[in-house]
A protein has these predicted regions:
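Internal hydrophobic scaffold segments of catalytic domains
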Residues: 1-10, 85-90
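Non-catalytic DNA-recognition/assembly elements of restriction-modification systems
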Residues: 1-5, 27-62, 67-79, 177-223
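Alpha-helical scaffold segments that mediate packing/assembly in large oligomeric complexes
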Residues: 4-30
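Structural beta-strand/beta-sheet cores of well-ordered domains, especially the beta-sheet scaffolds
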Residues: 11, 42-45, 59, 73-76, ...
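Short coil/turn segments at secondary-structure boundaries
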Residues: 20-25, 63-70, 155-159
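Proline-centric
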Residues: 39-42, 127-135, 150-152, 165-193
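A general structural signal for short secondary-structure junctions and capping/turn motifs
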Residues: 53, 65-70, 87-91, 119-121
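A short beta-sheet element
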Residues: 79-83, 89-168
């Protein structure tokens, strides 16, 4: 639903105008933006990823399999595409958007592999760790990043990599403050629900991974 609203507002540009009507469909004026290579609402502008994000890559710490074996716990350990393990302490706490840096960096549509994470986490050095600047939200940042074509910002063909400089320099739509705030207020309850469900799924996966070995070696049984 958040993606649908985003597309309606910032791809089709039918966000509510001052009369509550869809802007472009109601005759809202558009102008061509050379930097974005598309039409955008008149008097809107562009910005770069660097201007809307705080990059925390310097705080990442990779752990080897052996190191993680000695640190087993309940804190998710994130890699480029998802949770790789669970450890006994976090190095990050808060709300973040992760963008895969190397290895698997692109989904089937040619867009970045992203993860929206929250709470206490450990993150390795194969994914960029981003937070939005004031006035943006993690969900809006996630949606803006998801529209980036990886082919423009990647280096390498066999071993692809998205370096910090290429990511920072990529130009995106600059959304006016009032409309951005309205959008965030609209999708924030959806984001909260998504994160709650994601946490529940992670808890179930962790419980499954603990229970299955117990069942297989006879340490646990299921009664009828």
């Amino acid at each position: 639903m958040a993606k649908t609203i985003y597309n309606y507002w910032f791809i089709q540009f039918d966000f509510p105008d001052e009369n509550g009507k869809p802007y472009k469909s109601s005759g809202g004026k558009m102008s061509f933006c050379n930097e974005l290579n598309r039409e955008i609402p008149q008097n809107w502008n562009y910005t770069s990823i660097e201007n809307i994000t705080i990059c925390l890559d310097s705080e990442r710490i990779p752990l080897s399999n052996q190191q993680r074996e000695g640190m087993k716990g309940s804190i998710p350990y994130y890699g480029a595409t998802g949770i790789m393990d669970y450890v006994n302490r976090p190095i990050f706490s808060g709300n973040f958007v992760l963008l895969a840096e190397d290895g698997s960096v692109m989904d089937d549509n040619g867009n970045p592999i992203l993860q929206r994470v929250s709470g206490d986490v450990w993150i390795n050095n194969h994914t960029h760790v981003l937070q939005p600047v004031k006035g943006y939200s993690c969900r809006l940042l996630y949606l803006l990043l998801k529209d980036i074509p990886v082919s423009i910002i990647k280096t390498g063909s066999i071993q692809m990599k998205i370096n910090q400089a290429n990511l920072n320099n990529y130009n995106i739509l600059s959304i006016p403050d009032a409309i951005r705030t309205q959008f965030i207020n609209c999708v924030e309850p959806l984001d909260t629900k998504i994160m709650q469900i994601q946490q529940e799924n992670n808890n179930l996966i962790q419980f499954r991974d603990w229970l299955l070995p117990m069942l297989m070696n006879g340490q646990a049984t299921i009664e009828d």
